[in-house]
């Protein structure tokens, strides 16, 4: 699979998995380096391996869904626990695991752009690295769950470095009157950034229904998911 630099992702699909049983998986990444002769060679000392399981389809009689959203990492003087620092959300992950869910639903604000470090919004190369740094925190917090449970993820406003997102087919409206960039239509970040967020958060979902890309160039992800005894609509309602 080709490497997508802006989102630091590889995208691939595996067919023929037996949904009636748990199936182990293993993803192996072998980076390449340039040797003294200027040739690209495998860097076997830096091989990375990621392992988990594809869960068996649950019974149609009952299914438990864990819903997680708005994962703040730090709130300054506001303390909802003994430290006021929630990352890496160990208590949340532990309590979710204790419920033994069959499906995870991350309902938005998987990150907050200003948490722990200020948001970088330009230039685009630096903004993408800033986002990836904060997205990796999400994997750090919930990776032990997502490596063994199917997950539905829906981005919200802070995932795309926005305080509010007001539809308008993604088209950024001009600033008028007292409507700031946060409160007018569309995304304030460019399509390249929004699409990188989509590749990291929603690319694993079933293929979108309808047009895969808006006129402004932003990808879509509204789709359907059937799992166990449930049939779900995944909506991009921002």
Report the location of each language-model feature.
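Metal-dependent phosphoester/phosphodiester hydrolase catalytic core
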Residues: 1-238
């Amino acid at each position: 699979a080709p490497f997508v630099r802006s989102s630091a992702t590889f995208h691939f699909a595996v067919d023929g998995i037996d949904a009636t049983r748990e199936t182990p998986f293993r993803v192996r990444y072998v980076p390449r380096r340039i040797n003294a002769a200027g040739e690209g060679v495998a860097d076997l000392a830096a091989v990375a391996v990621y392992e988990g399981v594809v869960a068996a389809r649950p019974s149609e009689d009952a299914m438990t869904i864990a819903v997680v959203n708005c994962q703040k990492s730090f709130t300054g003087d506001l303390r909802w626990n003994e430290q006021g620092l929630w990352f890496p959300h160990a208590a949340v992950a532990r309590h979710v695991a204790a419920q033994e869910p069959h499906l995870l639903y991350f309902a938005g604000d998987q990150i907050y752009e200003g948490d722990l470090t200020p948001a970088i919004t330009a230039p685009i190369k630096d903004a993408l690295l800033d986002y990836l740094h904060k997205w990796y925190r999400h994997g750090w917090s919930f990776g032990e769950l997502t490596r063994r449970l199917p997950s539905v993820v829906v981005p919200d406003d802070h995932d795309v470095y926005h305080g509010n997102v007001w539809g308008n087919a993604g088209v950024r409206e001009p600033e008028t009157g007292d409507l700031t960039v946060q409160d007018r239509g569309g995304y304030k970040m460019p399509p390249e950034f929004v699409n990188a967020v989509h590749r990291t958060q929603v690319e694993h979902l079933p293929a979108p229904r309808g047009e895969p890309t808006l006129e402004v160039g932003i990808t879509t992800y509204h789709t359907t998911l059937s799992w166990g005894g449930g049939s779900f609509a995944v909506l991009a309602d921002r």
